[in-house]
């Protein structure tokens, strides 16, 4: 046994203060909770560097720099295998962020947050204060570590010299894992006892402890940790081994804390990653001591980031004790009352976040906190004011457009090569159906609104041509262009205006297209895209709620019209079926109701099915993502099987023909088709052009903002000015050919981005997967547009779709658009007592009556918009909508405090990659479908 006085002679106090090192590390490593700003993080308190003779710190080594990576902690407990009558160390639990415990049947339980008893924390603090610490031990084998540790135990009077041999043999016993045991029915916690006195060895004599180490391990089955731990341990992790055992010949519990000089694979140990720390907890059996819980507390302590960093840099016992006290200060204790509900436990989350926030607040002695402002938790190049901000104005004519081109086009070659991935092909198939379903639905409804002057044929061709050009030239090719609800509302309003003023609707659209091109050139020239920053959630939610109401209203309006055209009668005269009946037809109204309701309910069910527990996750997601086309297909089959009842079908021309060839052709003469277009209207068309531009600007720019969120970790950037020029410019040219203008559709674009996001493996059991990369390329959008264009050849199939089925999809889009709209949630709260209100910021931080006042103002704005939409002045709807922006910016700050507006109007939508808790893309975007 080495003389511990030799260790005492080499002790010296390091020149560098560990407090400074620890502060630097804490400041540089981003805290996992992204809701806590970097500038609000606090370092631990100043740590003393006084040495004690019981701390072993070799002077020849510098304090190792802590790793910011993951840590794997394994708890092994001394057990007796009653079947083989042998003692062995059994892996009882492990931690990779979350805790996994080994059940009695030998199967690993689900990952969960560690919950500790209050006693175990107090007892841990007690044994830590009297423990033995070896910091910076240069050993590469378990036998060497055990010898050093036992020598220190004897030197500090933790154990008697005659106990050394017994404990050494115990520490070097065979290790077993879950797959070695099958189940734990015959494995029980063991207690080391002396059967024949203090001098009689507990274990049989072995010729050499080092050479006979783990002599029976090869017979115990496969080596290594449990399969669960191995598969999910992040690379470059560091292992902490915690050993817990009971020994009745010991007089008191003893703790040994060992930090190796370098994390290395210990000889004689089969662990997945190099070992950096080793904790040994041994003691006599006592009624008030549960060594399993004590080991769990120690293992949980080693998984905590700040304590682990402190342990990596500590020079003495006091530094570790200070860090342990800080750990206890941030631990919550539940009193022994009745078990609270899950909802009540949710209130602990903000309390814990506040404790962590205070723990990481910068100390007064630290440098200016603004030094941390440039840190970007998402791996970007800086904050919103950085030079690469696409919305930053240059002050030059077309400066933003030129900067977009210079930023994005150098990646053009990689936009092609990055598409060489099976995930891109899968995304093409998925997005094709996601784009085709609304194109057919809106095309059919557009034909209804415009007497087939524009319909399915024009919309499919417009979507294909504009989509191909945008995929080739756009700055953000992940945007999906398409027709949307707001544009449908405008088309209906403009068609009614032209009808009432005896104007040719399709010619008026051509002049609107001409003015659209001029308007977008002016806006892009003066970098007007920066205005999107002033459009808050307040305006977005009013806009989305209005469109949802219009969708729902139009669905039932169309259904009522069917009941009026084909009323229910008590008796029917015999009828002969014709292609289009002239009078009432049996069951047409009821069957249309069944088709509409069936399509809606089926689509809603399949959407929720994605988050159910049936079938494997991938199959559920496929069924949920293709819910709309599956619903349409099923209801079309139902309609086909019931041949005796007439239903109105979708009107689709054969081939590349316009929907109404008797009224128009493919090229629109700007002076008029059948009569001269008024000169005054040629110039007055600038007003409706401005309104269309507002709609396209709102949808496209907000969609680009959502898709380009830093959380998505896209590296090639976006181009607000270039994309706006392309979308509006192509829409203006399309009007000359009698085709609809399009915008970037929010839900479809977010779905496209999610489909191309490659998620890495989870950092640990139960942890969320992190983004590995996003396939930012042009080929998927290009192929989707080509397939949509080829769908015009599916006329025999499309013409079999009943309009009632499209009404069901229309209703589905209206209802799903309400998801994620805070305004809708607050309207529901008007009818709930305050005690049933959810625990969310806009409820907790804002008084109830003031929250209802804010909701009431939004409802008034919504009512004004609905009145405008229902009058002949409906064409001015976008202009009235844009007035809500100055209302929010200028008037509401006079009524509400800044904190209240942040809670009620803040952008708290989270990026959704894996659908959990019933959330999907609709919950992420407060924009209409």
From Swiss-Prot:
Extracellular topological domain ranges are 447-454, 496-504, 561-588, 642-681
- Compartments, as annotated in UniProt: Cell membrane; Basolateral cell membrane
Spans annotated as Globular? 69-303
In which tissues has expression of this protein been reported?
A: Detected in erythrocytes (at protein level).
Which residue intervals make up region (Dimerization arm)?
317-370
The protein's GO terms of the molecular function aspect are: active monoatomic ion transmembrane transporter activity; ankyrin binding; bicarbonate transmembrane transporter activity; chloride transmembrane transporter activity; chloride:bicarbonate antiporter activity; hemoglobin binding; protein homodimerization activity; solute:inorganic anion antiporter activity
Phosphoserine PTM positions read 18, 199, 222, 363
Q: What name goes with this protein?
A: Band 3 anion transport protein
């Amino acid at each position: 046994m080495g003389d511990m006085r030799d260790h005492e002679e080499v002790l010296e106090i390091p020149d560098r203060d560990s407090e400074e090192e620890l502060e630097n590390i804490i400041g540089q490593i981003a805290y996992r909770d992204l809701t806590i700003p970097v500038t609000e993080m606090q370092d631990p308190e100043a740590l003393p560097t006084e040495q004690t003779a019981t701390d072993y710190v070799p002077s020849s080594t510098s304090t190792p720099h802590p790793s910011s990576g993951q840590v794997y902690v394994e708890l092994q407990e001394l057990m007796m295998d009653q079947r083989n009558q042998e003692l062995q160390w059994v892996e009882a639990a492990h931690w990779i962020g979350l805790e996994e415990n080994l059940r009695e049947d030998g199967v690993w339980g689900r990952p969960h947050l560690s919950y500790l008893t209050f006693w175990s924390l107090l007892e841990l603090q007690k044994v830590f204060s009297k423990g033995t610490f070896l910091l910076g031990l240069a050993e590469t084998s378990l036998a060497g570590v055990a010898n050093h540790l036992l020598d220190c135990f004897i030197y500090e009077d933790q154990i008697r010299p005659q106990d050394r041999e017994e404990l050494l043999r115990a520490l070097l016993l065979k290790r077993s894992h879950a797959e070695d045991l099958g189940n734990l029915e015959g494995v029980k916690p063991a207690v080391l006892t002396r059967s024949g006195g203090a001098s009689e060895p507990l274990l049989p004599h072995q010729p050499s402890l080092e050479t006979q180490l783990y002599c029976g391990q090869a017979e115990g089955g496969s080596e290594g940790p449990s399969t669960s731990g191995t598969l999910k341990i992040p690379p470059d992790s560091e292992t902490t081994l915690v050993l817990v055992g009971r020994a009745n010949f010991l007089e008191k519990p003893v703790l040994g804390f060992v930090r190796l000089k370098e994390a290395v694979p210990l000889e004689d140990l089969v662990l997945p990653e190099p070992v950096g720390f080793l904790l040994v907890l041994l003691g006599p059996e006592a009624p008030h001591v549960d060594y399993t819980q004590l080991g769990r507390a120690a293992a949980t302590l080693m998984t905590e980031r700040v304590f682990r960093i402190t342990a990596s840099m500590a020079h003495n016992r006091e530094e570790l004790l200070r860090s342990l006290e800080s750990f206890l200060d941030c631990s919550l204790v539940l009193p022994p009352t009745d078990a609270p509900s899950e909802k009540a436990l949710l209130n602990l989350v903000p309390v814990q976040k506040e404790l962590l926030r205070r723990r990481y607040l910068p100390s007064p002695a630290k440098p200016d906190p603004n030094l941390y402002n440039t840190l970007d938790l998402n791996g970007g190049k800086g904050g919103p004011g950085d030079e690469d901000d696409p919305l930053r104005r240059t002050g030059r004519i077309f400066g933003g457009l030129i900067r977009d081109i210079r930023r994005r086009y150098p990646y053009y070659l990689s936009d092609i090569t990055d598409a060489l991935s099976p995930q891109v092909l899968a995304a093409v198939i998925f997005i094709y159906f996601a784009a085709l379903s609304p194109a057919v639905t809106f095309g059919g409804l557009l034909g209804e609104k415009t007497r087939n002057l524009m319909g399915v044929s024009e919309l499919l061709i417009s979507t294909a041509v504009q989509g191909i050009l945008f995929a080739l030239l756009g700055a953000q090719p992940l945007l999906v262009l398409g027709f949307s609800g707001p544009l449908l509302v405008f088309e209906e309003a403009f068609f009614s205006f032209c009808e009432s003023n005896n104007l040719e609707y399709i010619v008026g659209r051509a002049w609107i297209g001409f003015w659209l091109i001029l308007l977008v050139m002016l806006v892009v020239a003066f970098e007007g895209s920066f205005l999107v920053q002033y459009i808050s959630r307040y305006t977005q939610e009013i806009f989305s709620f209005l469109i949802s109401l219009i969708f729902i209203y139009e669905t039932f309006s169309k259904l009522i019209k069917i009941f009026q055209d084909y009323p229910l009668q008590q008796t029917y005269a015999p009828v002969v079926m014709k292609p289009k009946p002239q009078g009432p037809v049996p069951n047409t109204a009821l069957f249309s109701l069944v088709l509409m309701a069936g399509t809606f309910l089926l689509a809603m069910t399949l959407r929720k099915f994605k988050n159910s527990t049936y079938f494997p996750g991938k199959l559920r997601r496929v069924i949920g993502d293709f819910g709309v086309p599956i619903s349409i297909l099923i209801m079309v089959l139902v309609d086909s099987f019931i041949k005796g009842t007439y239903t109105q079908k979708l009107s689709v021309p054969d081939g590349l023909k316009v929907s109404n060839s008797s009224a128009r052709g493919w090229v629109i003469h700007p002076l008029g088709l059948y009569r001269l277009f008024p000169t005054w209207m040629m110039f007055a068309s600038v007003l409706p052009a401005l309104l269309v531009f507002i709609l396209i600007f709102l949808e496209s720019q907000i969609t680009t903002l959502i898709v380009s969120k830093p959380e998505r970790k896209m590296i090639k950037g976006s181009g607000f000015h270039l994309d706006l020029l392309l979308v509006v410019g192509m829409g203006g040219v399309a009007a000359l050919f009698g085709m609809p203008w399009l915008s970037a559709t929010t839900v479809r674009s977010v779905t496209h981005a999610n489909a191309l996001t490659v998620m890495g493996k989870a950092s640990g059991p139960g942890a969320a997967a992190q983004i590995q990369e996003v396939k930012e390329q042009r080929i998927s959008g290009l192929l989707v547009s080509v397939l949509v264009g080829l769908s015009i050849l599916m006329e025999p199939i499309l013409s079999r779709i009943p309009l009632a089925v499209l009404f069901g999809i229309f209703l589905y889009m209206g209802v799903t658009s309400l998801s994620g709209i805070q305004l809708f949630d607050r309207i529901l709260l008007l009818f709930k007592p305050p005690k049933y209100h959810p625990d969310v910021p806009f409820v907790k931080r804002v008084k109830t009556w003031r929250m209802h006042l804010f909701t009431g103002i939004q409802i008034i704005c919504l009512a004004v918009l609905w009145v405008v939409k229902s009058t002949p002045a409906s064409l001015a709807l976008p202009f009235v909508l844009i007035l809500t922006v100055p209302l929010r910016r200028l008037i509401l700050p006079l009524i509400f405090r800044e904190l209240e507006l942040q809670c009620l109007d803040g952008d708290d939508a989270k990026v959704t990659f894996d659908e959990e808790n019933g959330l999907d893309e609709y919950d992420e975007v407060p924009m209409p479908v």
